[in-house]
UniProtKB/Swiss-Prot annotation:
This is Polyribonucleotide nucleotidyltransferase. It is found in: Cytoplasm. It comes from Streptococcus equi subsp. equi (strain 4047). Its EC number is 2.7.7.8. Residues 556-615 form the KH domain. Residues 691-714 are annotated as: Disordered. Its cofactor is Mg(2+).
Length: 714
């Protein structure tokens, strides 16, 4: 196929899609040019079905530093593992695409997005999402798209689609929404305490823009799309399914209705083991043994799935016996740990998170050097999910995509209420340790984070709480669930996380397993989440009503002084010599910004005071009219040089030593002598003139007759 180009304008920027020129061996490939951002997307499918019990979809978002005209850092000088932003963008694209493949599809699919040029005013992630949908849609991969995504900002009461950098910085909302022509299927958002009505309107505005992008894609697919390949779907033998359901469904239903999680899991597992043992014995010698046992496991999964959903939609009974809008039992505690700067323990049912806060000087902020201009990140929220939290063994190591994503969600939720840098000049790190998990652990980490912040004395604007909402839908009827647990998340259709204060929403995240949800469901879920959020905030505020007025004794204290910008080099010294000496002498940490704000950190207030004195003396300037007790350091024929303070000297001209005539300076002054002087002039080069005689009254002039007599006598 020769190169074909499709052009439109979207959100005020040119949008160009090119097909047929590059990556022609992939099943589908596109080059998307949006503004001056360029993204190459290639989609590839394996020829055989995998044997796993899940759909092996991999989406990558690769940031090439050359795209922004930057040289990679580090001694290797080449791109390494994906940045946090790249990982989050890959997840952002994966989530709306994954529901668009058929149930039972098991062929491995890889979608690789490579950023070739980067324009910070034209969203490369949204270009990559469009490219991913298009590469799959025009390929022979059986993808039930297209989908599209947009970013939405809210500036001065107006919604803006795919805002530029300046608009993003002014916005009260940072929303990414994706979906199909008919419905929304993915949401990721941070917001500055916006009400539910505005959030819902933003989602609908975003979906309208999505429909425009999908219409554009449909034109391209009609022109260059390939016929979809026939692939084998994972299906079970109908007669085997009927037999197992008839024999064991009643036992499985009874096990699923056990309310306590561990007991329910044990009862359910016992039924499954009995079924598997029976069929292992029957088909041990059968040449189709592996396929049959795979079918047995899949049938049991389907039976459990169907029963959980039936209980909720028909009987309005949840696995643990709660009402559809009921939260599990709550508990909150602060100061769980000694020595640390702040800690909070939050428990909701069988989900528990411990959040630990650390404060540090601004010099410890994280430096982000990606495609955007380098910047410093003051607030970090890290989320850890050890396998023991679900009673299992498993991999331990660096944080995976899920942990990075959950940490970022908590970070967005809590960042909206942090004090300004001017009011609280600290770097802040929160670490959420999930100690026990039965669903909604990311939201428990947000609640625990609020407790830790307030216990540490961080003056947040308001406490934040989070709740996870679920959905069970059969296409006609639906049930929205409050505070979903693991089983409801696994077998449900939606995981909709909502975090916020009493004032409004600070973060949203939605993933669904069906092709989309309606505005009515969104509105109902937001209203139900608000009620639950307020209930959790009641508990948090009962535990700690407001941030403590003082920091923990172990936290670094801080004092800030302002110096003239041209004095920064004086404090730092040649090669950092002066500031290093101050740090070594006092034991403090010192940060100086480009505006001359000097922040001094230490757990010892006396050390801070000593460092302040040293810095103040370094940047001190002599001012006209001020009087100093100075020391003579050099004598010349024309006057004496005196040291006013530190390394600041002034000249006392011979004419300024006394009111009477001075013939020799050395007759009046000697080196090391201490004298009082008054500054009378500072020139534009910083040279200082001082006077001794200005500090004594001028003697009266002699009368003329006396002067004549004295003259004749002389």
């Amino acid at each position: 196929m020769s190169k074909q180009t499709f052009t439109t304008t979207f959100a005020g920027k040119p949008l160009v899609v090119e097909v047929g020129q590059v990556a022609k061996r992939a099943n589908g490939a596109t080059v998307v040019r949006y503004g001056e951002s360029t993204v190459l997307t290639a989609a590839v499918m394996s020829k055989k079905m995998s044997t796993g019990d899940f759909f092996p979809l991999q989406v990558n978002y690769e940031e090439k530093m050359y795209a922004a005209g930057k040289f990679p850092g580090g001694w290797m000088k080449r791109e390494g593992r994906p940045s946090t932003d790249a990982t989050l963008t890959a997840r952002l694209i994966d989530r709306p695409i994954r529901p668009m493949f058929a149930e039972g599809f098991r062929n491995e699919v890889q979608v690789i997005n490579t950023v070739l040029s980067y324009d910070e005013d034209a969203s490369a992630p949204m270009a990559a999402m469009l490219g991913s949908s298009l590469a799959l849609s025009i390929s022979d991969i059986p993808f039930n798209g297209p989908i599209a995504g947009v970013q939405v900002a809210y500036v001065e009461g107006e919604f803006i689609i795919n805002p530029d950098k300046a608009q993003q910085e002014a916005s009260l909302l940072e929303l990414t929404v994706a979906g199909t022509k008919d419905a929304i299927n993915m949401v990721e958002s941070g917001a500055k305490e916006l009400p539910e009505a505005i959030m819902l309107e933003a989602l609908l505005v975003g979906h309208k823009a999505i429909q425009e992008l999908i219409a554009f894609q449909e034109e391209i697919v009609a022109a260059v799309g390939k016929e979809k390949a026939e692939v084998e779907l994972l299906q079970v033998a109908a007669d085997l399914q009927a037999e197992i359901i008839e024999t064991y469904n009643a036992d499985l239903q009874q096990a699923i209705q056990v309310e306590e999680k561990k007991a329910r899991e044990a009862a359910t597992e016992a039924v499954k083991e009995r079924v598997i043992a029976a069929y292992e014995e029957r088909y041990a010698a059968d040449e189709e043994h592996d396929r049959i046992m795979r079918d047995v496991a899949e049938i049991l999964e389907q039976m459990e799935h169907a029963e959980v959903r039936r209980l909720i939609t028909e009987d309005k009974v949840r696995p643990d016996g709660r009402r559809v809008d009921e939260i599990r039992p709550l508990a909150a505690e602060i100061d769980f740990l000694p020595r640390v700067h702040g800690s909070g323990l939050f428990t909701r049912g069988q989900t528990q998170a411990l959040s630990v806060l650390t404060l540090a000087p601004m010099g410890d902020t994280q430096i982000i050097d990606g495609l955007e201009p380098e910047y410093k990140k003051r607030f970090l929220h890290h989320y850890n999910f050890p396998q023991y939290s679900v009673g299992e063994t498993g991999r331990y190591g660096a944080a995976g995509r899920r942990e990075i994503g959950h940490g970022a969600l908590g970070e967005r939720a809590l960042a909206q209420v942090l004090p300004s840098l001017e009011a609280f000049p600290y770097a802040i790190r929160l670490v959420a340790e999930v100690l026990e998990s039965n669903g909604s652990s990311s939201q428990a980490s947000i609640c625990a984070g609020t407790l830790a912040l307030m216990a540490a004395g961080v003056p947040i604007k308001a406490p934040v709480a989070g709740i996870a909402m679920g959905l069970i839908s059969d296409g006609t009827n639906y049930t929205v669930l409050t505070d979903i647990q693991g089983l409801e998340d696994h077998f449900g259709d939606m995981d909709f996380k909502v975090a916020g204060t009493r004032q409004g929403i600070t973060a949203l995240q939605m993933d669904i397993k069906i092709e989309g949800i309606t505005p009515q469901i969104l509105e109902e879920a937001l209203a139900q989440a608000k009620k639950a959020r307020f209930e959790i905030l009641d508990l948090i505020e009962a535990t700690i009503a407001e941030p403590r007025p003082e920091l923990a004794p172990t936290a670094p204290k801080i004092d800030t002084i302002k110096i003239d910008v041209d004095k920064i080099k004086v404090v730092i010294g040649k090669g950092g010599e002066t500031i290093d000496k101050i740090i070594a002498e006092t034991g403090v940490k010192i940060d100086i910004d480009e505006e001359g704000n000097v922040s001094i950190y230490s757990s010892d207030q006396d050390a801070i005071n000593r460092a302040k004195e040293i810095i103040a003396s370094l940047v001190r300037e002599a001012k006209v009219g001020e009087v100093y007790h100075a020391k003579v350091v050099r004598i010349e024929k024309f006057g004496a040089f005196v040291n006013l303070f530190d390394k600041t000297d002034a000249l006392v001209h011979i004419s300024e030593i006394a009111w009477s005539r001075t013939t020799n300076v050395s007759d009046v002054l000697e080196i090391g002598e201490e004298v009082d002087v008054k500054v009378i002039k500072v020139d534009d080069k910083g040279r200082i003139d001082a006077s001794m005689k200005a500090l004594v009254p001028r003697p009266p002039k002699p009368e003329k007759s006396e002067a004549k007599k004295e003259g004749k006598h002389d």
